[in-house]
A protein has these predicted regions:
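Extreme N-terminal segment that seeds HTH/winged-HTH DNA-binding domains in transcriptional regulators
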Residues: 1-40
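Short, hydrophobic-biased segments on the C-terminal half of alpha helices
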Residues: 50-51
Length: 152
């Protein structure tokens, strides 16, 4: 595995990392089929992107065994999840969109957000700790708060 180049990942790379993170919540290793389904892309497109992600140190991919995030990939995935969830809060609390509208618009808009814009939106939205759907928002350092929610 090569060291991280210091280059910012593309929007597509960030999207893959965030989806791998979400899928790893259910299983430590993510299949390329489940990743293709989740991203709504053709299965042959997955290995090409995984090769790019592995070359900069974001993932470990073993063909036919699956993919998992490295620590660097996990950090980047959490930054992307932060962007998306802050954008959702901003769209609801500042712009007046409904939760479902906010999610749809956030899917379209979050790839274009940089950290500076994300932090400004967080400030305008009152430094939220949860998205409109109740999910925790990672902090600026990519740490998720400990959640002690109880299902009722």
């Amino acid at each position: 595995m090569e060291a991280h180049s210091g280059m910012e990942p593309s929007a597509a790379m960030r999207e893959y990392l965030a989806e791998i993170y979400r899928l790893q919540e259910d299983s430590p290793t993510v299949s390329t089929t489940s990743l293709a389904d989740r991203l709504n892309v053709s299965p042959p497109a997955i290995p090409r992107m995984l090769k790019r992600l592995q070359s900069v140190g974001y993932v470990k991919h073993v063909p036919y065994q699956g993919v998992e995030l490295t620590e660097l990939g996990r950090e980047e995935a959490l930054r992307e999840i932060r962007r998306h969830r802050i954008l959702e809060v901003f769209l609801v609390s500042v712009m007046g969109f409904t939760w479902d509208e906010a999610h749809e618009h956030a899917d379209d808009l979050s790839p274009g957000l940089n950290n500076r814009l994300t932090e400004r939106m967080a400030e305008m939205a009152g430094q939220p700790t949860r998205c409109p759907h109740g999910e925790p928002i990672p902090d600026r350092d990519g740490r998720l708060p400990v959640v002690n929610d109880v299902c009722v």
